[in-house]
Amino acid sequence: TKCYVTPDATSQTCPDGQDICYTKTWCDGFCSSRGKRIDLGCAATCPKVKPGVDIKCCSTDNCNPFPTWKRKH
């Protein structure tokens, strides 16, 4: 499987056994000005996340592109 991986958000071939791509988003102290933090990568199973963290998992090549946010002005 190929997934987008941060920090560069480039498409990379996942290690053997890691067939899930994920997009994890959450707010930090700069959320109001910069938007959510985003973490992209490969995993063997969809990662468990803490409350307040959104996770989306998928299993096709490059199915986790860097999200495009509508910027607040």
From Swiss-Prot:
Family: Belongs to the three-finger toxin family. Long-chain subfamily. Type II alpha-neurotoxin sub-subfamily.
Protein name as it appears in the record: Long neurotoxin 2
Tissue expr: Expressed by the venom gland.
Keywords in alphabetical order: Acetylcholine receptor inhibiting toxin, Disulfide bond, Ion channel impairing toxin, Neurotoxin, Postsynaptic neurotoxin, Secreted, Toxin
GO cellular component: extracellular region
InterPro entries, per database record: Snake_3FTx (IPR003571), Snake_toxin-like_sf (IPR045860), Snake_toxin_con_site (IPR018354), Toxin_cobra-type (IPR054131)
Lineage of source species: Eukaryota, Metazoa, Chordata, Craniata, Vertebrata
Cystines in this chain: 3-21, 14-42, 27-31, 46-57, 58-63
Signal sequence interval, chain numbering: none
SUPFAM superfamilies according to UniProt: Snake toxin-like
Cell location: Secreted
Molecular functions (GO terms): acetylcholine receptor inhibitor activity; ion channel regulator activity; toxin activity
A Pfam family this chain is assigned to: Toxin_cobra-type
Biological role: Binds with high affinity to muscular (alpha-1/CHRNA1) and neuronal (alpha-7/CHRNA7) nicotinic acetylcholine receptor (nAChR) and inhibits acetylcholine from binding to the receptor, thereby impairing neuromuscular and neuronal transmission.
Chain ranges passing through the membrane: none
Species of origin: Ophiophagus hannah
